[in-house]
Amino acid sequence: MSLKSERRGIHVDQSDLLCKKGCGYYGNPAWQGFCSKCWREEYHKARQKQIQEDWELAERLQREEEEAFASSQSSQGAQSLTFSKFEEKKTNEKTRKVTTVKKFFSASSRVGSKKEIQEAKAPSPSINRQTSIETDRVSKEFIEFLKTFHKTGQEIYKQTKLFLEGMHYKRDLSIEEQSECAQDFYHNVAERMQTRGKVPPERVEKIMDQIEKYIMTRLYKYVFCPETTDDEKKDLAIQKRIRALRWVTPQMLCVPVNEDIPEVSDMVVKAITDIIEMDSKRVPRDKLACITKCSKHIFNAIKITKNEPASADDFLPTLIYIVLKGNPPRLQSNIQYITRFCNPSRLMTGEDGYYFTNLCCAVAFIEKLDAQSLNLSQEDFDRYMSGQTSPRKQEAESWSPDACLGVKQMYKNLDLLSQLNERQERIMNEAKKLEKDLIDWTDGIAREVQDIVEKYPLEIKPPNQPLAAIDSENVENDKLPPPLQPQVYAG
């Protein structure tokens, strides 16, 4: 392995994470570097321009057709007759084709095909029950949450129900158009609460989170990785790419993390677990929360390793390493789902937006990873990618106990067992010493008591006056008053 002596590392200017229009919000590769707000503006401009161009094209074609028709009317009679017969034949043939197509796509055949598709796609009853239970739970939580807002809550619930009903009839639209509908709904509801309802911004954010949770729990199975997109193809491509890059080491990426430290190793495992867990969530906000937790574990791992706070230049290479090591399932589908249906304000600002933007950059870096990025020669990079060799194989040629990860872990465990054995021996010695001290203390107390008893013996002396017997005769009884004089009964 030929590594250059000077390592550049992976550096991304923080300004590159921001919207390229300069609005100050975070951009997104899926939005061509724009933030959600600027992308919507650019998208609408491009769409209006396309509509205008299509309208002009239609007008031009109509004029050409009218001119061609006018010129055909001025042609000779014979040619006109021949052309009319040709048109009649063409019309009859076209009518037969249309009739055949109509029969093929008749109502009965359409219904049958839909039933077949639904039966083919129908999940198991257990999955349906689980989804229904979760949907009911989220619905109840949403209604209970809106009850605290009284009239505003009623209006929000009404608008949300109307939106879901509208989305039910828009399933035939492209996923981009459905995403546009969701983004418009988020924008309109938030704006209506701020302008008409005078709701404080922090409460608007909480309400929007609950709205997103409610609607996306219901829409998830229809809009996550739909068949009309190439999301699944991208998932397979990035998984194949990550598997091909399994030989990449932390040193090649200049990752400032030492996994030999147990605390750091635990943080790395937790980060990988969080990024994998993202696929199990249904709400975009929950998926973002997994990315945020993963990123915080990365920052903690770097902080423990370096004994100082992590920087942005340390974070991105480590995030790339975590993605390569974890190979999260359906990574592109999850990124696209968050981009399309998450509340845009959450992606534009805050730590969620920052970490998500970095994840998008990490995926883009992995897709474009080359020899120069890893400070390798092109020859070594090609051999590693083809599987002919790997950096670990080359290190194993000069084998030492530290070169093998399994042996290294074994020695680490043996060292840990040795430390535990020493601690146990210390505890046993301390316990024996404590037992001996207790015995010595007991013997000392017994000796002291014996010495005191011998020094001060207990002597019982007889009394100087005899004790009065209880049953003896008392000659002075007659001096007592009558109520107190004892009475003697003959028995």
From Swiss-Prot:
Changing T357A: Strongly reduced activity. The keyword Calcium does not apply. Monoubiquitinated. SUPFAM superfamilies: Glucocorticoid receptor-like (DNA-binding domain), VPS9 domain. Residues 1-74 are annotated as: Interaction with ubiquitinated proteins. Changing Y354A: Strongly reduced activity. Changing D313A: Strongly reduced activity. Changing A58G: Reduces affinity for ubiquitin 3-fold. The modification Phosphoserine is found at S124, S132, S373, S377, S390, S400. Residues 66-85, 462-491 are annotated as: Disordered. Signal peptide: none annotated. One of its GO terms (cellular component) is recycling endosome. Residues 232-375 form the VPS9 domain. It comes from the Eukaryota. GO terms for molecular function: DNA binding; guanyl-nucleotide exchange factor activity; small GTPase binding; ubiquitin protein ligase activity; zinc ion binding. The modification N6-acetyllysine is found at K151, K170. Keywords: Acetylation, Cytoplasm, Endocytosis, Endosome, Metal-binding, Phosphoprotein, Protein transport, Transport, Ubl conjugation, Ubl conjugation pathway, Zinc, Zinc-finger. A zinc finger (A20-type) spans 13-47. Residues 69-84 have a biased composition (Low complexity). GO terms for biological process: dendritic transport; Kit signaling pathway; mast cell degranulation; mast cell migration; negative regulation of inflammatory response; negative regulation of interleukin-6 production; negative regulation of Kit signaling pathway; negative regulation of leukocyte migration. InterPro entries: DUF5601, VPS9, Vps9-like, VPS9_dom_sf, Znf_A20. It is found in: Cytoplasm; Early endosome; Recycling endosome. Interacts with RGS14; the interaction is GTP-dependent. Heterodimer with RABEP1. The heterodimer binds RAB4A and RAB5A that have been activated by GTP-binding. Interacts with RAB21, and with 100-fold lower affinity also with RAB22. Binds TSC2, GGA1, GGA2, GGA3, AP1G1 and AP1G2. Interacts with ubiquitinated EGFR. Rab effector protein acting as linker between gamma-adaptin, RAB4A or RAB5A. Involved in endocytic membrane fusion and membrane trafficking of recycling endosomes. Stimulates nucleotide exchange on RAB5A. Can act as a ubiquitin ligase. This is Rab5 GDP/GTP exchange factor.
